[in-house]
Amino acid sequence: MPDITRNILWSVLAAGTAFASLPASSAHADNAPADLLARGEYLATAGDCVACHTAPGGKPFAGGLKIATPMGDVVSTNITPDPDHGIGKYTEEDFEKSLRQGIRRDGSHLYPAMPYVSYSGLTDGDVKALYAWFMHGVKPVAVTPPTTSLNFPANMRVAMAAWNMLASNTPPESGDSATFDKLRRGRYLANALEHCGTCHTPRNMMLSEEQDSYLAGAPLVGWYAPNITSSKTSGIGNWSEDTLVQYLHTGHVDGLSQAAGPMGEAVEHSTSHLTDEDLHALAAYILQVPAKEDSAEHKPRESFGQPVEAADVRSGDLTRIDDLSEMSGQYIYDANCAACHGPNGAGTSDHYAPSLFHNSVTGAGRPDNLIMTILNGVDRTADGQHVHMPGFDHDSDVQRLSDNEIASVANYVMTTFGSGDHAATPEQVAKLRKDIAKTP
């Protein structure tokens, strides 16, 4: 697909991150049972609604998060129950149409960055619980975020009617989702509430999910959501159910993987708050998804590498502060990475700084996630532990590395500790650097 076509389509998909606040008569009840509110809150957490609908430093669900696209900035809207600035005048029917059909109260179409394609699979009972909680459990916030204003053709919502006819919506589930058996509950969580396929399933020319490649991996605003099918070489077929549960609960498994970027955010705001029963249901379902192979990966990502006894590259000579010459990847690693990850790449003894070998990021068949981690850093709180790694992009407070330096250190790390030299280039880093602003 030509880049310009993909950019335009992604702009269209990115534009509709929320429900619109439109005048109407309020029709929701003045109160709701406590158990219904508790269920609605849990479902909203599982759906990770707060991620897109809360600006940095802003109040929960008040909108205002800006996402840069080639066609302009997308701004998420207020979905608190404020009657004038949020969705306080939505009836339950209005809410259901927005949530499951992507249709606003005025009849216009939402853009599918609001994952109604997945939420269409929600049961009637869960939609009712979500509505009750958003109307009675969320604090109203009297703030109207800036209006999203995109350039042509991304500003044409009417095009979404045609797109919806081609998209594969998740069929609605029936019955009480709380009573589903383990695999059915796991499928419900994966396909509807957690909408795993939104990130991990590749898309076709029209940016509709390719259902025959479900969870086979896909690019995502600079990051790469990896193959999480049951393939033992390209996916996570070697992971146990308990291992995947630990990852979803904490975002980290020693000697295996750690969550950063959008997945780190999903762990922090969503999966780390699920019950053990739901985590096991979700893990059990994902681990039986049919295997899909990836031409870029022929060996389990976590199987690469070993401790490296590298020679000390420090000469003892002082470096002048005005010496702006770029260092090699090995020197950059020694100066910026070795203090935490160790000269041999083994990380810290408590695994706070992870090992760089037996690591699914450095063992991947693509350098994208390593580059984005170097640029973005890691900032994740889950299971009561805050994990932080500084980024090294142009806003870094520790060291601002050039595109060439980041490419050099990424190639050094993957060659020394991971799956080999993937020939990352400064041009590739520059392109991924631009995507940082697009990451919620």
Language model features with spans:
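Short, contiguous acidic/charged loop-to-helix segments that flank catalytic cores in large enzymes
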Residues: 235, 347, 356-365, 380, ...
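C-type cytochrome heme c attachment motif
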Residues: 42-54, 77-78, 94-101, 112, ...
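C-terminal segment of classical bacterial N-terminal signal peptides
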Residues: 17-26
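Flexible coil segments in periplasmic/lumen-exposed cytochrome c-class electron-transfer proteins
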Residues: 32-35, 54-73, 105-187, 191-192, ...
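Bacterial N-terminal signal peptides that target proteins for export
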Residues: 2-12
